[in-house]
Swiss-Prot record:
Catalyzed reactions: N(2)-acetyl-L-ornithine + 2-oxoglutarate = N-acetyl-L-glutamate 5-semialdehyde + L-glutamate
InterPro entries the UniProt entry points to: AcOrn/SuccOrn_fam, Aminotrans_3, Aminotrans_3_PPA_site, Class-III_PLP-dep_AT, PyrdxlP-dep_Trfase, PyrdxlP-dep_Trfase_major, PyrdxlP-dep_Trfase_small
Protein name: Probable acetylornithine aminotransferase, mitochondrial
A GO biological process held by the record: L-arginine biosynthetic process
Swiss-Prot/TrEMBL cofactor(s): pyridoxal 5'-phosphate
Pathway: Amino-acid biosynthesis; L-arginine biosynthesis; N(2)-acetyl-L-ornithine from L-glutamate: step 4/4
Top class in the EC scheme: transferase
Gene: arg1
HAMAP family: ArgD_aminotrans_3
MF annotations from Gene Ontology: identical protein binding; N2-acetyl-L-ornithine:2-oxoglutarate 5-aminotransferase activity; pyridoxal phosphate binding
Source organism of the structure: Schizosaccharomyces pombe (strain 972 / ATCC 24843) (Fission yeast)
């Protein structure tokens, strides 16, 4: 099948000739005499190996491109795993970060912090227009998505405790979900391979079935404090939630007095084609809590947990905190990023490039049915669905100068920056097609 045939096509001498007709491996993996290889060796001697890294040493970025230590240019359809949504080395991001660094980098949360206050105001005003959350929202700033989700779990349980007392602490999550790697967020991440060796995890969590409205009442009951769901699943395999599923979740949460948490860490802030991924159901399935992170400051570490006024009223000084949460540099940049990502210019480009990508994906499905079985996603959070694990496809695309990401369920994730230009999309698609041609021979 796919992997076996593709490996044979590379190794056999006859197939090598046919293979080279379609692809030119201009970005081969570094050889022992290169600067990149020496850096990779040093990393292995000094850093704990928890990442399956590509053999690429990123030296700099510019827009939708990454450059390695040998000066080779790559089209970046990973965006730092949906982080650099405004592209690499955005001039205004760089200017604002440098200016804030020259004034104040950190003062602790003992003092008021104007950049954090300004960012919270921008986010809250945006949600007032684009989300159905009742009443004004309030925000807790953290450093990443995992911390934002941990905060969401704590706040949801605290709100349930204050209203209902002990015994209402259950958290419901879904198959193929990914919410983080700390003990709490790992407990509500579905993939068992991430959990092996780290048990026991958080008690009183229940896994339910994603996109199955009929099954919700089996899992959401009087003991449920919160339901956490991704409006578009990312790492577990690109899968948008059906509107009727989110509506059913809202109704189930209302029935038992549970909080509905939308994890928009990967799908939010414009990547779905809307600034807030849940806004397509804002009038009928608004959340009580939203978590965001990845693109919030275009690469600077930041996360945010946004809650309704009812939940905020149950959280008091000393009940949560973060040393670096609300960092002035990240928040100063974040204010610009939220405004820019919510602009009509960016959102129109997301929808335009979505059409360009999916039009070619339709061709791929028709031309290469032995390799591609379909695609899914919203906006520029797309998954090309392979018939078998796509590791060889991703490797060969990289060796032609295109960076892609694996995803669950045999997906290849396609995550360009949201301001990506037409010619970059076209070139990336051409590399994908040449790789598919080669692997299909």
């Amino acid at each position: 099948m796919f992997q076996r045939r593709s490996l044979l096509s590379v190794r056999s001498s006859g197939s090598q000739i046919a293979f080279r007709r379609f692809v030119s491996l201009t970005h081969k993996d570094p050889t022992p005499d290169t600067t990149s290889c020496n850096i990779i060796k040093k990393e292995g001697a000094n850093i704990i190996s928890v990442y399956a890294r590509y053999p690429v040493v990123a030296a700099k970025g510019e827009g939708s491109y990454l450059f390695d230590k040998e000066g080779r240019k790559y089209i970046d359809f990973t965006s730092g795993v949906a982080v650099t949504s405004l592209g690499h080395a955005h001039p205004e991001v760089a200017r604002l970060a440098a200016d804030q660094c020259s004034k104040l980098v950190h003062s602790s949360n003992l003092f008021y912090n104007e950049p954090a206050i300004e960012l919270s105001n921008v986010i809250n005003n945006s949600l007032a227009k684009n989300s159905g959350i009742a009443g004004p929202t309030k925000i807790f700033f953290a450093n990443c998505g995992t911390e934002a989700n941990e905060t969401a779990l704590k706040f949801a349980r605290k709100a349930a405790f204050e209203k209902y007392g002990e015994g209402k602490s259950q958290i419901v999550y879904f198959n193929n979900s990914f919410h983080g790697r700390s003990l709490g967020s790992l407990s509500i991440t579905a993939n068992p391979k991430y959990k092996r060796g780290f048990q026991p995890l958080l008690p009183d969590v229940v896994q339910a079935v994603y996109n199955d409205p009929a099954s919700i009442e089996q899992f959401v009951n009087d003991k449920t404090a919160a339901v956490i769901v991704e409006p578009v699943q990312g790492e577990g395999g690109i899968c948008p939630a059906k509107p009727e599923f989110l509506i059913a979740l809202r109704k189930a949460c209302d029935k038992v007095g549970a909080s509905l948490i939308y994890d928009e860490i990967q799908c939010g802030l414009g990547r779905s084609g809307d600034l807030w991924a849940h806004s397509i159901v804002k009038d009928v399935a608004s959340p009580d809590i939203i978590t965001v992170a990845k693109p919030l400051a275009n690469g600077l570490p930041i996360g945010a947990t946004i809650v309704s006024s009812k939940i905020a009223a149950e959280i008091h000084p000393g009940e949560h905190g973060s040393t670096f949460g609300g960092n002035p540099v990240a928040c100063r940049v974040g204010t610009f990023c939220v405004n820019e990502l919510g602009s009509s210019k960016i959102l129109q480009n997301v929808r335009k490039q979505h059409k360009a990508l999916t039009s070619r994906f339709d061709d791929f499905v028709a031309k290469y049915p032995n390799l591609i079985r379909g695609y899914a996603g919203r906006g520029l959070l797309l998954g090309l669905q392979f018939t078998e694990p796509p590791a060889k496809f991703i490797e060969l695309a990289r060796q032609q100068g295109l960076l892609l990401l694996p995803g669950g369920n045999n997906n290849t994730r396609v995550l360009p920056s949201l301001n990506v230009k037409d010619e970059v999309i076209a070139k990336g698609l051409d590399i994908m097609e040449s790789t598919l041609k080669a692997l299909s021979k």
